[in-house]
């Protein structure tokens, strides 16, 4: 999927959403690092956050791509600035067939409609592969994520606890028809 974005300065910029390639692993790791620090600083204990980020370096992403994980990237002027991962729902007790596992953008690209574009691309691919309905989990304290998925029409269907070191945080599942 390729589209043009019109900036207020009247400059057109090409964005592309496409399947990740192994050569994207380094940039995806950089997006992951920046987005997680921005989204979870103060929500996930510092040591746990650093541990989680460090596990997802370029080698981890290269392996995910080589395994055939469903992973789309948003390419903005030939730079990866966002990604989304998705597949079969991991919680069988929920009726949704699919799941968006992660959707992240570089912090400076949030609020520009790029997250919606990644979401819609993942939604369309899930539907094309037999997953017409899906869920997305977000930390309950992550107000931006909660607002984003609510704005897109998600309905809160489940709350669960997730442990980060010695602390627990609530996470919320949003269902999309």
Each model region followed by its residue ranges:
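Structural motif
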Residues: 31, 129, 151-152
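Conserved beta-strand-loop-alpha-helix junction that forms the acyl-donor binding cleft
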Residues: 136-145, 163-168
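Short phosphate-binding/catalytic loops that engage adenosine nucleotides
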Residues: 114, 131, 154
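Active-site acidic-Proline motif in GNAT/NAT acetyltransferases
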Residues: 106-108, 112, 140-141
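Acetyl-CoA-dependent GNAT
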Residues: 15, 19-25, 30-108, 116-121, ...
């Amino acid at each position: 999927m390729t589209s043009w974005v019109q900036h207020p300065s009247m400059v057109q910029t090409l964005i592309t959403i496409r399947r990740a390639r192994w050569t994207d692993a380094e940039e995806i790791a950089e997006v992951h690092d920046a987005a997680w620090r921005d989204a979870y600083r103060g929500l996930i204990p510092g040591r746990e956050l650093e541990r989680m980020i460090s596990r997802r370096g370029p080698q981890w992403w290269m392996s995910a791509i080589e395994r055939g994980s469903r992973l789309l990237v948003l390419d903005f002027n030939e730079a990866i600035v966002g990604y989304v991962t998705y597949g079969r729902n991991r919680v069988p007790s929920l009726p949704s067939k699919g799941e968006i596992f992660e959707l992240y953008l570089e912090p400076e690209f949030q609020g520009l409609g790029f997250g919606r574009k990644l979401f819609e691309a993942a939604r369309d691919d899930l539907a094309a592969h037999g997953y017409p309905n899906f869920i997305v989990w977000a930390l309950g304290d992550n107000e931006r994520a909660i607002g984003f998925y609510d704005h897109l029409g998600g309905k809160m269907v489940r709350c669960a606890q997730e442990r980060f070191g010695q602390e627990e945080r609530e996470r919320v599942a949003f269902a999309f028809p």
